[in-house]
Swiss-Prot record:
The keyword Cytoplasm does not apply. One of its GO terms (cellular component) is cytosolic small ribosomal subunit. PANTHER family: RIBOSOMAL PROTEIN S15, BACTERIAL AND ORGANELLAR, SMALL RIBOSOMAL SUBUNIT PROTEIN US15M. Part of the 30S ribosomal subunit. Forms a bridge to the 50S subunit in the 70S ribosome, contacting the 23S rRNA. It comes from the Bacteria. Pfam families: Ribosomal_S15. One of its GO terms (biological process) is translation. One of the primary rRNA binding proteins, it binds directly to 16S rRNA where it helps nucleate assembly of the platform of the 30S subunit by binding and bridging several RNA helices of the 16S rRNA. Forms an intersubunit bridge (bridge B4) with the 23S rRNA of the 50S subunit in the ribosome. Residues 1-20 have a biased composition (Polar residues). Belongs to the universal ribosomal protein uS15 family. Residues 1-24 are annotated as: Disordered. GO terms for molecular function: rRNA binding; structural constituent of ribosome. This is Small ribosomal subunit protein uS15.
Length: 88
């Protein structure tokens, strides 16, 4: 689970301007952190299908935001993919 401090650090690293919390970059970075956090949960709880459904929902939401960013600004998209080490 991400702490408030972790979220604030992620937002500061990815914000476009001061006070920016809603840009696609920030949203994708927060979703990526939550997804990575859940990956560790599934290493020990292999049969937790209820939480797995939530994980798939987060992955789908991240994919939609990345598709939006790709259509809007390809350079920002590529920079974000490289920064977060996402494959695509």
């Amino acid at each position: 689970m991400l702490t408030t401090q972790d979220k604030q650090n992620i937002i500061k690293e990815n914000q476009q301007s001061e006070g920016d919390t809603g840009s696609p970059e920030v949203q994708v970075a927060l979703l990526t952190a939550r997804i990575n956090d859940l990956q560790g949960h599934f290493a020990t709880h292999k049969k937790d299908n209820h939480s797995r459904r939530g994980l798939l929902r987060l992955v789908s939401q991240r994919r939609k935001l990345l598709d939006y960013l790709h259509g809007k600004d390809v350079e920002r998209y590529r920079a974000l993919i490289k920064k977060l080490n996402l494959r695509r």
